[in-house]
Amino acid sequence: MAQQRRGGRRRRKVDYIAANHIEYIDYKDTDLLRRFISERGKILPRRVTGTSAKNQRKLTVAIKRARIMGLLPFVAED
């Protein structure tokens, strides 16, 4: 039997921050930061979110600041 090929071209993920013209990622903007955190509280990687390297670094700093200030959890509660 011949194998069937599946799939096709995957759609390229769009950088949410660049697409919405967000220049400064504020650590107090928890609604924005929660988009880039998993349900367990971990920072999502670039390959999942589609952010650029520059914006991923800015996001990481903002998320870590928000965690230290107590605005975001370090780990999710069960």
UniProtKB/Swiss-Prot annotation:
Keywords: Ribonucleoprotein, Ribosomal protein, RNA-binding, rRNA-binding
Highest taxon listed in the record's lineage: Bacteria
GO cellular component term of the entry, any: cytosolic small ribosomal subunit
Pfam families: Ribosomal_S18
Key word Isomerase present: no
UniProt keyword annotation of Iron present: no
One Gene Ontology biological process: translation
GO function terms (MF aspect): small ribosomal subunit rRNA binding; structural constituent of ribosome
Self-association state and partner proteins as the record states: Part of the 30S ribosomal subunit. Forms a tight heterodimer with protein bS6.
Described purpose of this protein according to its UniProt entry: Binds as a heterodimer with protein bS6 to the central domain of the 16S rRNA, where it helps stabilize the platform of the 30S subunit.
Family: Belongs to the bacterial ribosomal protein bS18 family.
Protein name: Small ribosomal subunit protein bS18
Organism: Ligilactobacillus salivarius (strain UCC118)
